[in-house]
């Protein structure tokens, strides 16, 4: 079936070491050991980007611009090219040629396809050693301390998405001046949040939430 072609399961349990304590954590095979499906990832990312668009950009063409009902000058005898309205796009104050108009950009993606995209990206990150787990994230509201934490774990300069079950205010304050770091909640992260980075850094609570969200409670 389609599901069996896209997903591969292994009997052996996957484990990953914590960066800060070297403790082993078990990863669910049905979340972190899934064969890559680029089409599912592509469709999900495009849908998220499309659905984020307002689609309200608008301009007025010659028929929408107010005024211009009077013929600017007589048809013949002036030597000018004939005109029937002063709101022609050729005139100052006229309409816009081929300007933007409101559009509906919404793109639907099936739930199973989107779930598969999440699992594919997480599995790919684990496979390429771009998925790091820590027991706890920095709790001091100091950027200096946060940078030290990144340096200590050899993460400085990499585009990082930090995932946790709850975004702590102190962590938010410490990281908001670091341009290559973004914070997201495990319960609401998007496909693009996981995809658009060099590395995912996640704490234990975030790992549990992700496993439940995409792999079920068992």
Question: What residues fall within each predicted segment?
Answer:
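Extended polybasic, low-complexity segments that bind anionic RNA or targeting/receptor surfaces
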Residues: 2, 8-50, 54, 100-218
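Short linear sequence motifs
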Residues: 2-3, 91
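Intrinsically disordered, low-complexity regions enriched in polar/acidic and amide residues
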Residues: 3-4, 82
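Short coil/turn segments at secondary-structure boundaries
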Residues: 56-62
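Glycine/serine-rich anion-binding loops at beta->alpha junctions
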Residues: 62-98
């Amino acid at each position: 079936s389609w599901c069996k072609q896209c997903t591969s399961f292994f009997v052996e349990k996957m484990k990953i070491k914590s960066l800060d304590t070297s403790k082993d954590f078990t990863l669910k095979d049905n979340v972190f050991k899934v064969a890559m499906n680029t089409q599912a990832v592509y469709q999900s990312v495009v849908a998220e980007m499309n659905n984020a668009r307002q689609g309200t950009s608008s301009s007025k063409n010659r028929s929408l611009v107010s005024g211009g009902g009077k013929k600017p000058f007589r048809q013949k005898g002036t030597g000018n090219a004939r005109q029937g309205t002063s709101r022609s796009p050729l005139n100052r104050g006229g309409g816009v040629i081929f300007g933007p108009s409101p559009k509906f950009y919404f793109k639907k993606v099936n739930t199973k396809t989107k779930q598969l995209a999440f699992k594919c990206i997480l599995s790919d990150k684990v496979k390429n050693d771009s998925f790091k787990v820590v027991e706890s994230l920095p709790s001091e509201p100091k950027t200096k301390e946060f940078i030290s934490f990144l340096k200590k774990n050899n993460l400085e300069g990499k585009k990082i998405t930090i995932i946790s079950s709850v975004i702590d205010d102190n962590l938010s304050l410490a990281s908001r001046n670091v341009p290559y770091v973004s914070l997201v909640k495990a319960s609401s992260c998007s496909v693009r949040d996981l995809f658009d980075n060099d590395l995912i850094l996640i704490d234990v609570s975030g790992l549990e939430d992700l496993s439940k969200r995409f792999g079920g409670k068992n």
